[in-house]
């Protein structure tokens, strides 16, 4: 099972020219449900639609009892936890994370999220490159 993802999943105002500065409130950006998640949503705060040529800056929010099942992506993830606590499994290793923790998830590495104390929020930076999310089947 696979799920396509990317910055084009979120509608924005017209893109400024590449290299133009962008300043806006995160609350002005719509939060969209993560289709494969439980009580999980994402905002694309900055990306190619805003003229950012190299990276996509996203904010994820998961409520108590929420999470995202084990999956892989074709791009690396750099993450910074804003609030809440979660159990994140990366390549089979379980980590409990909370505010001010940072994570690096290499491309192609299986990872999942399970909220321990919600809401759980984190910033996720990914390269502006094609990505495909693939769910990892249990027991494999």
What are these regions (language model features)?
Residues 75-86:
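Glycine- and acidic-residue-biased ligand/ion/polar-headgroup-sensing regions
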Residues 58-73, 107:
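Conserved short histidine dyad/triad with adjacent acidic residue
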Residues 74, 93, 109-110, 118-119, ...:
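A generic "binding-loop/recognition-motif" signal
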Residues 60, 85, 93-95:
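Well-ordered beta-strand scaffold positions
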Residues 92-107:
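Short acidic-glycine-tyrosine-enriched beta hairpin
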Residues 1-54, 137-140:
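A short, N-terminal "cap"/entry segment at the start of jelly-roll beta-barrel domains
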Residues 69-70, 88-89, 105, 111-117:
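Short beta-strand His + acidic residue motifs that chelate non-heme Fe in jelly-roll/DSBH
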Residues 59, 104, 118-134:
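A short hydrophobic beta-strand segment most commonly corresponding to one strand
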């Amino acid at each position: 099972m696979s799920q396509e993802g990317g910055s084009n999943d979120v509608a924005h105002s017209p893109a400024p020219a590449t290299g133009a500065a962008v300043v806006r409130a995160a609350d002005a950006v719509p939060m969209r449900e993560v289709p494969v998640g439980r009580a999980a949503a994402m905002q694309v705060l900055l990306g190619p639609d805003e003229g950012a040529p190299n990276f996509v800056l996203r904010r994820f929010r998961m409520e108590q009892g929420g999470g995202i099942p084990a999956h892989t992506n074709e791009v690396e993830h750099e993450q910074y936890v804003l609030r809440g606590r979660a159990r994140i499994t990366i390549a089979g290793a379980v980590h409990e994370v909370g505010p001010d923790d940072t994570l690096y998830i290499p491309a192609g590495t299986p990872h999942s999220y399970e909220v321990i104390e919600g809401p759980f929020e984190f910033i996720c930076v990914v390269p502006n490159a094609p990505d495909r999310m693939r769910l990892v089947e249990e027991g494999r």
